[in-house]
Amino acid sequence: DTVIMIRSGYRKFVTFPSPYLLKKGCYMPSVDLVDMFLRLAEKYGMKFYFGLYDSGKYWDTGDMTWEVEDNKYVIDEVWENYGSKYKSFGGWYISGEISRATKGAIGAFHALGKQCKDISNGLPTFISPWIDGKKAIMGTTKMTKEDAVSVQQHEKEWDEIFDGIHEVVDACAFQDGHIDYDELDAFFSVNKKLADKYGMQCWTNAESFDRDM
């Protein structure tokens, strides 16, 4: 019943002809995928969640603040051109991915979540972070890492993050692919406890592949 576009663009490649992003040097897409997905979602009675734009600057710098500026314009454009026209426009995915207390993350999630909700009369918003577990080894040559986050530290950091964003972020879908199978219960129990504490929905992002193959 739901389809989620995980991001509307990454660096110079975009899924819809955004006047703002095209002016900044992004490539004109051959098909307006956002319009197509919304039309198809309407046809089949599904809800479409729009994923925000990812400039790549956060990945380059570790500072989430970069992602707010571009998305200010993207959110306005998308609501005006699509959200206000299609009943299938069901919500927003704030596409910045973090795993730990990250520079600028609380402020960025709050600013983006608030703008999304304000412009769309309160449509739902969600995030999908990863857990900094033993399989979180992107950008290294290792199969696992030694300094994986403990359940206690994960709880402490996400308690602080949820405290700062729960008014404008409705749900959190932790990715499940970065921790060991026998750690799932411990981490997911904490995730549910924190979501309940702050009145958020606790979803799961089931990664149907294993990272330690």
Where are these predicted regions, by residue range?
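Glycan-processing catalytic domains of CAZymes
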Residues: 1-213
